[in-house]
Amino acid sequence: MAVSPDDPLILVGRVAGGFGVRGEVRITTYTEDPLSIAGFKALKRQDGSPALTIASARKTKDGVVCRCPGVETKEAADALRGLRLYVPRSALPEPDDDEFYLTDLVGLTVRHIQTDQLLGRVKSVQNFGAGDILEITPDLGGPTWYLPFTRAAVPEVRVSEGLILADPPALVGDHEGPEEKGLDENEELGDRD
């Protein structure tokens, strides 16, 4: 099933495995309210094909536990572990004027807040465990780089204008950035003060 570029799919959760012996499915949700995933009912795979239909859901300390037609055993639920769950962008409620979805940041132009220098475009939003970061593709080529998605580094987001104003931390190697502190050639990691 083709995914429409006008209505892209948005990742809202991931199957964590089975729960109990009756085929209930544990889902880690990426929604503000974990139970809101049950409101979508039919969840899709990344290619747009059907993934799961939620008949009922309840919140647990680790996410949401759902009953899904066609998943009747713990083994069947465990076999779904890792399955990413998507919904069309149009299924999400519209954010308030001063709010946005992280997916709305992809493709926005990034400019330096003080110099107006073009820094690049947002390629993706990542989270490796320490908070959201923006992967930036420089417009003039070169390797992508990461920008912490914090108020200090990203003081302004103007989704309607397609713009992010950023104040990136100094990069290692910049003359104004932090000094690089390497090891002496005879020093071992454990010997540093």
Swiss-Prot record:
Residue stretches making up the PRC barrel domain: 97-172
An example Gene Ontology molecular-function term: ribosome binding
Entry keyword Chaperone: yes
An example Gene Ontology CC term for this record: ribosome
Keywords: Chaperone, Cytoplasm, Ribosome biogenesis, rRNA processing
Record-level GO BP terms: ribosomal small subunit biogenesis; rRNA processing
Cysteines engaged in disulfide bonds, as pairs: none
InterPro entries: PRC-brl_dom, PRC_barrel-like_sf, RimM, RimM_N, RimM_N_sf, Transl_B-barrel_sf
SUPFAM superfamilies tied to this protein: PRC-barrel domain, Translation proteins
TM spans (from-to): none
Domain of life of the organism encoding this protein: Bacteria
UniProt feature, compositional bias: Basic and acidic residues: 173-193
Any one Pfam family match given in the protein's UniProt record, by short name: RimM
Cellular localization per UniProt: Cytoplasm
Disordered, as annotated region: 168-193
Family of this protein: Belongs to the RimM family.
HAMAP family: Ribosome_mat_RimM (MF_00014)
Function, in words: An accessory protein needed during the final step in the assembly of 30S ribosomal subunit, possibly for assembly of the head region. Essential for efficient processing of 16S rRNA. May be needed both before and after RbfA during the maturation of 16S rRNA. It has affinity for free ribosomal 30S subunits but not for 70S ribosomes.
Domain notes: The PRC barrel domain binds ribosomal protein uS19.
Summary of subunit composition and partner proteins: Binds ribosomal protein uS19.
The protein's name in its UniProt record: Ribosome maturation factor RimM
